[in-house]
Amino acid sequence: MINHYFHQLLAITLLVSSTTAIAERGPAIPDYPADRVAENVYVIHGPLGVPSVKNQGFMNNPAFVIGDKGVILIDPGSSVQTGEMVLRQIRKLSELPVVAVFNTHIHGDHWFANQAIHDAYPDVAIYGHEEMRKLVLKGEGQRFFETLMRMTEGAVAGTLEVPPNQSAAHGDELTIAGVTLHILFEPKAHSYSDIMIELPQQRILFLGDNVMSKRLGQMDSGTFNGNIAAIELALESRAEIYIPGHGRTGGREVPETYLDYLSSLKTEVAKHFEEGLSDFEMSPLIVETLSRFSDWVDFERNVGRHISLAYLEVEAELF
């Protein structure tokens, strides 16, 4: 049942900056192809990089599963415009209604498109971890939206905040439209609110931003230890197909490669911390050690910040 307090949230708040008129709306998102990764399972692989004017804020991997009586959608995207594009791709493949949406975590590039799905299917169940729902109530969605508005120069304008109305917790097993889904959760991973969704029958695992491929994102909202633990949990599954939050779908090499990055960075930071180096002093040494990742999108933008955050984490572990 939908929680009573969540009916209050669904008195949907328009997310616009104070300088943006309510009537304004960003342009439509062009169609991106839905790539078949397994029978009845599709991923719309978004462009890599940060939100921008060029990508209109769309840069994640919306995915959907066509069940026997409906469609299940994972992380529909960053705006109402993205959600409308995702629905267009679904309708090219199925006339069934969207009956459930899963949001992997709090970052709005994955869930602000809920609005378009809710507009088309007002009774749709939207799942997220309880920690995500709490963070929405604390205003994390609003803050992320303001960033999207700035970085896209208003391309996401007109988007409404439609948060999850159902909770999904670690170990939950659901059957929706004939599809079995198993929920995995590791606290303090990429964002403190990250669920991963396993399709055990298809041996598929949706990783959310616990894993990225060929792209480095921010780590300000989580921890290295928790993110590493989440990937190790993912690799304990029987999945053969792994779908990251950003980047191309693949096999075990997808989570294993990102695990290599996080583990190597954290290990190097701890080593140089013991040697008495500051984060600034160790940074060029670690960047050289991680040179195998230097062709990843946003490596230069984020690796220094990652080193500083890992330094603080190592320091905190001493107390």
Segments and roles (model prediction):
Residues 40, 65, 75, 90, ...:
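Divalent metal-coordination and catalytic microenvironments
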Residues 1-9:
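Bacterial N-terminal signal peptides that target proteins for export
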Residues 24, 236-238, 249-319:
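Accessory terminal helices/loops
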Residues 17-19:
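N-terminal signal peptide c-region/cleavage motif recognized by signal peptidases
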Residues 39-92, 195-207:
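Conserved beta-strand hairpin/beta-sheet module of binuclear metal-dependent hydrolase folds
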Residues 70-72, 78-80, 173, 180-264, ...:
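Metallo-beta-lactamase
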